[in-house]
Amino acid sequence: MRFRLTEGNFIRIGAYKEGNTAVFTFAAQKEDECNIVLTDIVQKKKYNIEVPAQYSLGSLRSVRIHDFDCEKFSYYYLLNGVRHIDPYATIIYGREKWNDCDRAKKDYEIECGIDKPAIDWKKDIQPEIGRDRMKLYKLHVRGFSMDTVQKNKHAGTFEAVSDRIMYIKKMGFTSLLLMPVYEFEEMTVPIKHVVPDYVKPKYSQMRTETEPGHLDKADEKVNFWGYTRGNYFAVKASYANEPSDAANEFARLVQRLHKNNMECIMEMYFPDNTDHNLILSALHYWVQRFHVDGFRLLGDKLPLTAIIQDAMLSRTKILHDSFDMSVVPKDRRYENLYIDRAEYQFPARMMLNHINCNMNELLNQQRKQGENIGFINYIADNNGFTLTDLFMYNDRHNETNGENNTDGPSWNFSNNYGFEGPSKKKFVRDIRAIKWKDAMLMLFLAQGVPMIMAGDEICNSQSGNNNAYCQDN
């Protein structure tokens, strides 16, 4: 098969369809040897396309492939002979099945694809709920809908969450906060080391031979939460009922939320060295392509000034632990910035469990509100005890994480009220129930925006695990 190539478009980084052509724009020095490797998805045949240096501008290389059917091919880049996954890819092939151990046989390889939008947004209206009415319900798409009571063919997917929108709405919540729903590696991928030639014979004798593609169950650990470097432009395929239609399934979830006058807010974690241009482009992409209503940004060294001043994001809620309010545009009409940190959590826990409580500090937290900024209040988040475990355990019990109970927060300001873990004693059960109700009342009477973790409304327990990042159960 022969492909006709011309120079691409340097304005937009990534791979995308434009008419009957596909444009591939990626970072590369002019001196680099660059190739696009295309894979026919059905026939599995590969095509190596050289991208000449003449298609360079600055540190970008861009090529247009004419008469190209995006749906038939996956791709990856070869830069100086080294395989690279496109950080701007809108589809990731290879992770369609959650925690698929068979991927070890293929060395955990993934490839990229080009998304083809198929959702009509013309009638979509974003609610833009003010902070005086906003109530957050945080959930993990897979964990929220994998319970056995209502388990069905699409448990653990966007469709399952969509089916429970009315359950969330009837509790009074206005906004859904989703833990990472972009593509990330949930499996523990072995790190490859290059062994020098002079030690290879000795090294091969030391190795214990295992069956190809075999994983020792004792060494497996799933990254359930997803707070790691991700493929920030691709919807997680394993969260979809039909992985090949993941983007549209997520879009339909957002549409249904909007029809019920509810918001969709995404958590996005960016490691320290993430390119700032990529971060801004990713936020733009989710706002344009999926009409999401906000982001809870996690990570240090984020381009917050650029995000705050970005015109496209001016009506998108931004949740972060701090902001420089001096850079906020003076003509900003919509209050879209929210301080989100654990400063409410600890005074509330200390008062509820009678642990060195400072009433002045607690009262300040209860009534705090900014003139042009909101505050997110919570007593329990995914990082720490559940609300129920806060009154059932004095100490963490993270043994099942496989780290000798050394992981997770050491200071929880919790109280087991006389018995560690579940108890049959009426006095213990009654006081725990009272404390749970006190916590909910305190949270929802505070001036800030309340947030609860999915399951806290039904007294969900993690058996004292305050760092359940690898617990898929």
Question: Whereabouts are the PLM-identified features?
Answer:
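An acidic-aromatic substrate-binding cleft motif
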Residues: 115-184, 202, 223-226
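Conserved alpha/beta catalytic core and glycan-binding cleft of carbohydrate-active enzymes
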Residues: 104-105, 291, 304, 308-454, ...
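Active-site neighborhood of glycoside hydrolase catalytic domains
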Residues: 248-328
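Conserved, mostly hydrophobic/aromatic
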Residues: 26, 139, 168, 178, ...
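Hydrophobic faces of well-ordered beta-strands that scaffold small-molecule active sites
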Residues: 135-137, 176-178, 264-266, 295, ...
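Short proline/glycine-enriched turn/loop motifs at strand-loop junctions of beta-rich domains
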Residues: 27-33
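Aromatic- and acidic-residue-enriched carbohydrate-binding clefts of CAZyme catalytic domains
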Residues: 150-156, 188-259, 270-289, 400-421, ...
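The feature marks proteins involved in alpha-glucan
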Residues: 1-21, 46-50, 55-138, 145-150
